[in-house]
Amino acid sequence: MPRALWTAWVWAXIILSTEGASDQASSLSCDSTGVCDGHSRSLNSIPSGLTAGVKSLDLSNNEITYVGNRDLQRCVNLKTLRLGANEIHTVEEDSFFHLRNLEYLDLSYNRLSNLSSSWFRSLYVLKFLNLLGNLYKTLGETSLFSHLPNLXTLKVGNSNSFTEIHEKDFTGLTFLEELEISAQNLQIYVPKSLKSIQNISHLILHLKQPVLLVDILVDIVSSLDCLELRDTNLHTFHFSEASISEMSTSVKKLIFRNVQFTDESFVEVVKLFNYVSGILEVEFDDCTHDGIGDFRALSLDRIRHLGNVETLTIRKLHIPQFFLFHDLSSIYPLTGKVKRVTIENSKVFLVPCLLSQHLKSLEYLDLSENLMSEETLKNSACKDAWPFLQTLVLRQNRLKSLEKTGELLLTLENLNSLDISKNNFLSMPETCQWPGKMKQLNLSSTRIHSLTQCLPQTLEILDVSNNNLDSFSLILPQLKELYISRNKLKTLPDASFLPVLSVMRISRNIINTFSKEQLDSFQQLKTLEAGGNNFICSCDFLSFTQGQQALGRVLVDWPDDYRCDSPSHVRGQRVQDARLSLSECHRAAVVSAACCALFLVLLLTGVLCHRFHGLWYMKMMWAWLQAKRKPRKAPRRDICYDAFVSYSERDSYWVENLMVQELEQFNPPFKLCLHKRDFIPGKWIIDNIIDSIEKSHKTIFVLSENFVXSEWCKYELDFSHFRLFDENNDAAILILLEPIDKKAIPQRFCKLRKIMNTKTYLEWPVDETQQEGFWLNLRAAIRS
């Protein structure tokens, strides 16, 4: 029994493990190009069943703890492997041995406490390696990256345990585009550890304290293009002039990101600018200045300039003691060579006039997202301020008057580009004054609802996007580029107002159409962006847009951003794909064709009615309907005649002199109804015929060639035909006065023809000896 239980337990474990592996494999989603996504799937191991078809594998943000030698051995074509944000603590020696095509490897933020060079010995084409955020203290006992000749991006270190950098650590690396070292607790830096790298385009250093910063600078200053310092407290930073003064430098850019300064350490950094002569650009991003700006007692006055720095960028500068801050007059002399300054989102409300006057080389000034107003701008743009300034950006400040803003900037004689977007101007005056060389103006997101002659006529580029404009009727003879998206325009501007326009972006308005003629009127237009509008996909619009093969070269957002809004059955479709029916596009032609078809149908109907006696059928139908209103069969008391006689006028002699004499003078006499004698004068002939036939017991037809051609006889025969058809009786008596071909009786009298074919009729004998028998038979037929 225990053995049976043991066997069952083993099989259960095998089944569960198989199901688990199957579940993990199924948790990957792979596309046809070999890109497999398995991130954030709660995987605790690398899925089995991976093949050579996998080219990119993302297993980040899972719970994987172990990478074995066989886990990836079939992925011989793998180029990208992401294993970041797992719990990996062990990677076997040959885990990546078969990945000879691997170019991107991310092992960041795991639990690796030891690194092995054997992991990378076959990764000759590896270009990107991220080892950040693990638990190792050093980069291994041997040179870790000596087998990676093509490595371009390397990220190493962590924020806690990584404390040592040794000379062997980066041996074998010659050129790096980016090197990131996270070493907040760095305690040991062996000189020349980074010296072996001949060129580094961008070095990112995470250092909590600046103790070893100068030592690192000594090693890299001749091989580095850009140094970025992150998360560092520079309160105790001291720059040693002797350490770098005699060395050639290649550093062109310094970036300080989330760095804390004091007045003292800031002066030390300024000294660095002087001695590292190659620095052209300095950037401070999200930094904090823990001081009051009192640099006079710190020998800053002995520094005459900022070295060769031409570009200064400051973003999100925090000054906790802002209200105690000095006037910065001590740094004015340092700014003479600076050409480009950006101070963004730093609560700047004023640039002192003296500082503006010292910025004699300044060509570009960006004061976006600050607190500048017309009152403070007046002081900043004082006489002789920024004499060579060409571009001024005052985006998202507190400017309110467009007229006053333009007037205050008249002192800037060389200004040609002005960005005052995202200020609340609301309206535009009729006239304004601007610097004489103004060529570019940005008024986007300023809530203006109309444009006036306030705009300078010298403009070549105008941006009025994201406002409340519903029309554009300004004459700007030199304008080359117009940006007017996200407004309320219903049509394209008049080309005669903009004779040299080459670029127009007018997307997301309420334009519903434009024509070939409109586009052709812009003779120099090369770029048009008009997507995101509510286009009415009319036949003309579709014919124009779908028939112009070269349209895609002008419409930069064609075809995806051009969608139909109407008609409803094509709403949401791309204009390029929309199709309308023939009736929608050629309505006049369709109506004309329909009218012609209707005329032909009527003509054909008329011909057929004439050919097949359709008019007769309609007349008889009307007569029959009238007859249907009356009793189906008249009561006996309404029968006034023994017989109604239908005959041709040309046969009247035989009827009136022979038949009437024989029947009405017979004893007992027969009462006959003759149209000449008994029809009621003034009554409609059809009614006379109907009444006479209905009041007669029988109807006698005296058939002859004359009868067939008689119009009167036709009416009598017509209604009699309907009576025979409707009542199905034998009230008709046919007398053949002379031999007549049955074919002479019209085809439409099918019932009468049938009677002649199936029943006997009386034939008037030419032989007088047989005439007495004829009358005898006729009287018998009438009585029947």
UniProtKB/Swiss-Prot annotation:
LRR repeat residue intervals: 54-77, 78-101, 102-125, 126-150, 151-175, 176-199, 200-223, 224-250, 251-278, 279-308, 309-337, 338-361, 362-388, 389-414, 415-437, 438-457, 458-478, 479-500, 501-524
Residue stretches making up the TIR domain: 639-782
Membrane topology category: Single-pass type I membrane protein
Motif interval(s): ATG16L1-binding motif: 761-778
Compartments, as annotated in UniProt: Membrane; Cytoplasmic vesicle, Phagosome membrane; Membrane raft
Cross-link entry Glycyl lysine isopeptide (Lys-Gly) (interchain with G-Cter in ubiquitin), positions: K754
Site (Interaction with bacterial lipopeptide): F349
Keywords: Cytoplasmic vesicle, Disulfide bond, Glycoprotein, Immunity, Inflammatory response, Innate immunity, Isopeptide bond, Leucine-rich repeat, Membrane, NAD, Receptor, Repeat, Signal, Transmembrane, Transmembrane helix, Ubl conjugation
Post-translational note: Ubiquitinated at Lys-754 by PPP1R11, leading to its degradation. Deubiquitinated by USP2.
Bilayer-crossing regions: 588-608
Segments on the Cytoplasmic face: 609-784
LRRCT domain ranges (all copies): 525-579
Extracellular side, ranges: 21-587
CC per GO annotation: Golgi apparatus; membrane raft; phagocytic vesicle membrane; plasma membrane; receptor complex
A GO biological process held by the record: cellular response to triacyl bacterial lipopeptide
Alphabetical list of PANTHER family matching this protein: TOLL-LIKE RECEPTOR, TOLL-LIKE RECEPTOR 2
Functional note: Cooperates with LY96 to mediate the innate immune response to bacterial lipoproteins and other microbial cell wall components. Cooperates with TLR1 or TLR6 to mediate the innate immune response to bacterial lipoproteins or lipopeptides. Acts via MYD88 and TRAF6, leading to NF-kappa-B activation, cytokine secretion and the inflammatory response. May also promote apoptosis in response to lipoproteins.
Protein family according to the UniProt entry: Belongs to the Toll-like receptor family.
Protein name (Swiss-Prot/TrEMBL): Toll-like receptor 2
Organism from which the protein derives: Bison bison (American bison)
